[in-house]
Amino acid sequence: MARNVLYPLYQLGGPQLRVFRTNFFIQLVRPGTAQPEDTVQFRIPMEMTRVDLRNYLERIYNVPVAAVRTRVQHGSHRKRDHRNVRIKKPDYKVAYVQLAHGQTFTFPDLFPEKDPRLEGSSVDEAQSTFMADEQQRQGSDPQRGGVPNWFSL
């Protein structure tokens, strides 16, 4: 699952406790098209296999997995640099994980839509309070005894 795993040397009498950390990073991606509720889409490294992903999710995150399907998404090469040479984005692997029976996943709504009616009233209130504060600030100071503000040090 992990590349270049170096285990510590064996020492007599010492316990062989090992913490296994992977050097794989997976990204949970919002699907572009509608998918069933039990299917989750990930973006994974090219070296990671479907068995690795299944073990990763089951052992580290305790997520029961029914099936894993993968495909390779080729990076686009439409962009060109200052020398008119094509620049290719790197390829990546997309994995579709089907969760076990009864498990569902819905992508969280991180930025909910705001009600425009509530937004407009708060803007009007903020503008009216701002104008009241400005008028109070620009009014004459009673301690100056009628002397204008421009006539000061």
Swiss-Prot record:
InterPro entries: Nucleotide-bd_a/b_plait_sf (IPR012677), Ribosomal_uL23-like (IPR013025), Ribosomal_uL23/eL15/eS24_sf (IPR012678). GO terms for biological process: mitochondrial translation. Coiled coil: none annotated. One of its GO terms (cellular component) is mitochondrial large ribosomal subunit. Residues 131-153 are annotated as: Disordered. Component of the mitochondrial ribosome large subunit (39S) which comprises a 16S rRNA and about 50 distinct proteins. This is Large ribosomal subunit protein uL23m. It comes from Otolemur garnettii. SUPFAM superfamilies: Ribosomal proteins S24e, L23 and L15e.
